[in-house]
Design a protein with these regions (language model features):
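Extreme N-terminal starter segment of soluble prokaryotic enzymes
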Residues: 1-4
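NAD(P)-binding Rossmann-fold cofactor-contacting core
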Residues: 22-49
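Short beta-strand/turn micro-motifs composed of small residues
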Residues: 7, 33, 98
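Short, Asp-centered acidic motifs that coordinate Mg2+ and/or phosphate
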Residues: 30, 69-70
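ADP-ribose/adenylate-binding Rossmann-like module
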Residues: 71, 76, 82-101
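Glycine-rich, highly charged phosphate/nucleotide-binding loops
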Residues: 46-64, 72-80
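N-terminal Rossmann NAD(P)H-binding glycine-rich loop of SDR-like oxidoreductase domains
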Residues: 6-9, 13-18
Length: 101
């Protein structure tokens, strides 16, 4: 299963990057960060401290509906609405791990 991640540069995002790297059944296919983030273009494995992987951090505005089978959201309450709007528009299943809602 191809898994996409909203908030790859956060604490839990980095944990999920590492967990997906160890998974036999799920692979990280896209990792998003804010459009103005300094992490855009950075390799997600290097960001998570696990070495270079096949995925670079992508600006949210560059996300395609074909990039993943499911998205996981570990962002902030202030941006979750826009992420959910994107998921609804693209008929993308989403798992929400964001706290403080």
């Amino acid at each position: 299963m191809k898994v996409g991640l909203f908030g790859a540069n956060g604490r839990m995002g980095r944990v999920l990057v590492e967990a997906l790297d160890l998974s036999e059944d799920a692979q990280l296919s896209v990792a998003t960060v804010r459009d103005d983030s300094p992490w855009v273009g950075l390799n997600v494995g290097e960001l998570a401290g696990i070495g270079k992987k096949d995925v670079d951090c992508t600006a949210l505005s560059d996300l395609s509906g074909n990039d993943a089978d499911v998205m996981i959201d570990f962002t902030l309450p202030s941006v979750i609405e826009s992420n959910l709007t994107w998921c609804i528009k693209n008929k993308m299943p989403v798992v929400i791990g964001t706290t403080g809602l």
